[in-house]
């Protein structure tokens, strides 16, 4: 089984991925790790590399290609990243696709705390990164990153603990797998 976890910055992707990993024993892989590594190799911050990628599509194609190849060849994994679910959809890679969300304010507080920066600076960086990513994904792949129709479950993390979100997601996976297996038998008897 592959589980993808997507969401905007500060929605809880990394934290929830780790919680699901604790329960399932699956390893977590972050698409952001590939992107950060590429930025580091070029001596750029994430924000600078995002701007660079806007005019150098090969930066995104390389990162996304690595993620696609990885997901095609590995199982029992959790892949966390903005495009993880979309990559599975585009390339018909079997996965349970999760999208996490929270209000902008909550995401700002989380991002500010994680990065150790003031809220105003966090707002500027968050907005800049999200605008850049939305434009790039639309230009490169024709993907509207705000289209949630591809996901198997969409979860508001605003008032839930990460452990609760993990259990909700895993219960939904269990529910869907049982439904696919048992529903036809039930219907035949009616």
Swiss-Prot record:
Q: Which GO terms describe its cellular component?
A: cytoplasm
**The organism sits in which domain of life?**
Archaea
User: Its Enzyme Commission number?
Assistant: 2.7.4.25
Q: Which UniProt keywords apply?
A: ATP-binding, Cytoplasm, Kinase, Nucleotide-binding, Transferase
Q: Output one GO MF annotation.
A: CMP kinase activity
- Give binding positions for ATP: 7-15
Q: Where are the transmembrane segments?
A: none
Catalytic activity reported: CMP + ATP = CDP + ADP; dCMP + ATP = dCDP + ADP
Enzyme category, top tier: transferase
Q: Where in the cell?
A: Cytoplasm
- Give GO terms for biological process: pyrimidine nucleotide metabolic process
Coiled-coil stretches: none
Annotated InterPro entries: Cyt_kin_arch (IPR011892), Cytidylate_kinase_dom (IPR011994), P-loop_NTPase (IPR027417)
Family assignment from sequence similarity: Belongs to the cytidylate kinase family. Type 2 subfamily.
HAMAP family cross-referenced by the UniProt entry = Cytidyl_kinase_type2
* Protein name (database record): Cytidylate kinase
| Organism per entry | Thermoplasma volcanium (strain ATCC 51530 / DSM 4299 / JCM 9571 / NBRC 15438 / GSS1)
Q: Which gene encodes it?
A: cmk
């Amino acid at each position: 089984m592959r589980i993808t976890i997507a969401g905007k910055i500060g929605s809880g992707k990394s934290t929830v991925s780790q919680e699901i990993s604790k329960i399932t024993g699956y390893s977590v892989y972050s698409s952001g790790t590939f992107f950060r590594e590429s930025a580091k190799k070029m001596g750029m911050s994430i924000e600078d590399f995002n701007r660079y990628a806007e005019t150098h599509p090969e930066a995104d194609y390389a990162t996304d290609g690595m993620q696609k190849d990885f997901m095609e060849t590995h199982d029992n994994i959790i892949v966390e990243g903005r495009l993880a679910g979309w990559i599975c959809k585009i390339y018909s890679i079997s996965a349970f696709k999760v999208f996490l969300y929270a209000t902008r304010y909550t995401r700002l507080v989380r991002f500010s705390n994680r990065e150790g920066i003031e809220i105003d600076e966090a707002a500027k960086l968050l907005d800049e990164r999200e605008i850049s990513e939305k434009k790039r994904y639309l230009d490169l792949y024709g993907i509207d990153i705000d289209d949630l129709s591809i996901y198997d479950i969409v979860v508001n993390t605003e008032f839930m603990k990460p452990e609760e979100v993990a259990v909700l997601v895993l219960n939904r996976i269990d529910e869907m797998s049982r439904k696919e297996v048992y529903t036809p038998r039930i219907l035949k008897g009616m």
